[in-house]
Amino acid sequence: MRRPVGRRIFIKINGVQFMTNKSNKYLITSALPYVNGELHLGHLIGCLLPSDIYARFCRARGRDVLYVCGADEHGTPVVVGAAADGMSIQDYANKWYEKHLRAVRDFNLSCDLYGRTHTERQEKLIHELFARLDAQGLIEERETLQPYSATDNMFLADRQLLGTCPKCGYENARGDQCDKCGATYEADELINPRSAISGACDVEMRPTKNLFFMASRVQDVWRKWLKSHAPKWSKTASAIANGWASDELRDTSITRDLPWGIPVNKPGYENKVFYVWFDAPWG
């Protein structure tokens, strides 16, 4: 990360003099773990510890730091987990959030806030964001074919659906992404789909309306922004972003037929929620 330009101040910590920058603020976060299981060393090493170390380093340099993280409470992992445990989704989320919070304290992580995404504040934020995007012509309604299980009597979204990855052939890929090769795709691209809830293979594609974020309409602006900002990032982050920029941005569905999540604030969509990847990054 490039050092910000600002007023330089020298401080001493344990007799060692450091040059710092008091005029800049640092917001530090990390990926939000799902509330569908215990936090473990994998979360600590791959997700939470790097951000915690950087937050501590910045504070030691006298920087103005806000370090936030929290639990990702929405999406199909939570819905599927609650059903498997025979619990209400809210009780299931509460159970694991409290366990996560205790683990964060036990690990002595220095978060200023370890929050959660199923809150009134989060709902208000997402509703405001959606309204702004809609007003700018970046939201479009489309009727698409989505997987429906006759056995479960419901549409299957994301992790409620399993099948063979269309990219690498992995046989236990999720409905929206493959955990083996990292590919993302639409549900109708999944090969030999089956329900993750009942295991039923009677999955058929039925029409349903969803709202799409029109990423294709902002790709030129995004590429221009990326060109000026990516050089400031780590080589890994820059390479990943530039890899995305080499392809066309794909318009993406941001609503789901699920009983849990941030409700969609648009007439006709009262029974749908926002896709977790539209909701959680703002948490």
Residue ranges and their predicted role:
Residues 1-17:
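Intrinsic disorder/low-complexity segments
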Residues 28, 35-37, 110, 135, ...:
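Glycine-rich, flexible loop/turn motifs
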Residues 20-29, 34-142, 154, 166:
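N-terminal Rossmann-like or analogous alpha/beta NTP/dinucleotide-binding catalytic cores
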Residues 133, 178, 279:
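Residue-level signal for inorganic ion chemistry
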Residues 137-210:
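Cys/His-rich short segments
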Residues 20-62, 66-69, 121-124, 168, ...:
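Structured secondary-structure scaffolds
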Residues 76, 98, 176-179, 213, ...:
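Residues on a specific face of well-ordered alpha-helices
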